């Protein structure tokens, strides 16, 4: 899976947001408000865009490596729910 458009994650006065950038900005108008974990997912998906995407399993592994104090099942559940929202908004491609 991969993002349908390139996105930039920014911290604006403590509020983490993501916006489409470059040529892709015409595909998505608006801004996503994110928590830290969702921002990490966007960043992972952005990095894997040029490689053709990343599998759900590898995305979750990457998150579990960063968030070692968190329950692996909760990480996977959060990732699944967030990716489902991205899919519903047309921001995720398989």
Model-predicted segments: where are they?
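Long, charge-rich, low-complexity alpha-helical segments
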Residues: 30-94
């Amino acid at each position: 899976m991969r993002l349908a458009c390139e996105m930039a994650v920014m911290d604006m006065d403590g509020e983490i947001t993501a916006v489409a950038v470059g040529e892709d900005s015409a595909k998505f108008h608006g801004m996503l408000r994110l928590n830290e974990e969702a921002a990490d997912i966007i960043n992972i998906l952005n990095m894997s865009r040029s490689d053709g995407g990343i599998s759900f399993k590898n995305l979750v592994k990457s998150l579990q490596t960063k968030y070692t104090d968190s329950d692996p099942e909760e990480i996977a559940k959060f990732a699944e729910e967030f990716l489902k929202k991205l899919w519903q908004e047309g921001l995720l491609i398989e």
